[in-house]
């Protein structure tokens, strides 16, 4: 006959289960974090080409291109103290993940006569990575 009280056994069981989940997080969580890190790191590498013309932190001055800080949810071609070309001033869309993906795919199709020296990213995976990275670094 087991002399350990029911309450004590229950406490031990809860402790063991809690310890297992603390030491070994669920596999899906590990895979998701790894995938997100993979895209973030790829986006960071891709963005190195962008920083020659763009800044991305609050209160940084513009370069050849506008500061990208706070771009998601903002109307394209509208940034305080930046003089956009007529093509950009006439842009009629809000920056979202979808519009940025379309722009990154073919910038000159989306904004004809756009002066930005960027021909686009054909790789959907690269566009996804750059968008994930930008969402992390340019949002307030």
Name the predicted role of every residue range.
Residues 29-47, 58:
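Electrostatic cytochrome c docking/interface patches
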Residues 62-67:
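Short cysteine/histidine-rich zinc-coordinating motifs and their immediately flanking basic loops
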Residues 1-8:
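N-terminal secretory signal peptides that target proteins for export/translocation
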Residues 54-60, 73-74:
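Detector for the c-type heme attachment site
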Residues 18-31:
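C-terminal segment of classical bacterial N-terminal signal peptides
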Residues 94-140:
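C-terminal capping alpha-helices of c-type cytochrome domains
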Residues 43, 48-56, 130, 134:
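The canonical Cys-X-X-Cys-His
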Residues 78-98:
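Short Fe-S-cluster ligation motifs
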């Amino acid at each position: 006959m087991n002399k350990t009280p029911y309450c004590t056994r229950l406490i031990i069981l809860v402790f063991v289960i809690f310890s297992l989940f603390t030491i070994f997080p669920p596999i899906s969580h590990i895979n998701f974090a790894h995938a997100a890190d993979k895209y973030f790191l790829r986006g960071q590498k891709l963005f190195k080409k962008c920083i020659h013309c763009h800044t991305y932190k609050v209160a940084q001055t513009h370069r050849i291109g506008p500061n990208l800080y706070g771009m998601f949810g903002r109307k394209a071609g509208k940034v305080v103290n930046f003089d956009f070309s007529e093509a950009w001033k006439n842009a009629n869309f809000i920056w979202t993940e979808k519009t940025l993906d379309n722009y990154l795919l073919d910038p000159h199709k989306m904004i004809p006569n756009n002066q930005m020296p960027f021909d686009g990213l054909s790789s959907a995976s690269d566009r996804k990575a750059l968008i994930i990275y930008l969402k992390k670094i340019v949002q307030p």
